């Protein structure tokens, strides 16, 4: 499938160049999830079964006017795509908080202290050293980034911050 995706992407780029639109186009290629192959020996395969890095880290390629080659090392979210596009593709200059929850992916040093990720029924608050997983009934577990339970762990301040952040959607 990667070969086929590459072929299709090549066609899109060739078409944009043929129409003279390539130099004015911001192209973003990414995925909605990663894939587990029993990476941590905990029998997780596929996707949508946990919030560890093999399932939530996705590749992203961004090309366009003013986009410098580089790699983002900090913790980011797909919520950061819209602010990037609004600022760099559409030229919006007002504060990002006027229209988005995320940050500009092209801003130097972008690195969230936590990000939220969801599956069909669960969500996770992902921090550099832990993941707090909350299921559809409100039951929770705290695991390390390799999915090993952290015994007697308490909620970090990030979980409370995330709950406040979520409230704006559930009033």
Name every feature range the model reports, one short phrase each.
Residues 4-6, 39, 103, 107-108:
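Generic structural "secondary-structure junction" signal
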């Amino acid at each position: 499938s990667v070969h086929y995706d590459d072929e299709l992407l090549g066609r899109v780029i060739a078409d944009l160049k043929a129409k003279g639109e390539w130099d004015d186009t911001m192209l973003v290629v990414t995925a909605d999830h990663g894939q587990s192959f029993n990476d941590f020996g905990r029998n997780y395969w596929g996707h949508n079964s946990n919030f560890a890095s093999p399932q939530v880290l996705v590749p992203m390629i961004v090309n366009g006017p003013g986009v410098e080659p580089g790699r983002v090392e900090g913790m980011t979210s797909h919520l950061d795509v819209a602010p990037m596009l609004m600022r760099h593709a559409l030229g919006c200059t007002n504060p990002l908080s006027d229209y988005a929850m995320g940050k500009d992916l092209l801003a130097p040093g972008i690195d969230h202290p936590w990000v939220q990720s969801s599956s069909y029924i669960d969500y996770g608050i992902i921090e550099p050293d832990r993941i707090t997983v909350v299921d559809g009934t409100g039951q929770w577990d705290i695991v390390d980034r390799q999915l090993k339970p952290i015994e007697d762990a308490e909620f970090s301040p990030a979980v409370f911050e995330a709950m406040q952040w979520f409230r704006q959607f559930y009033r």
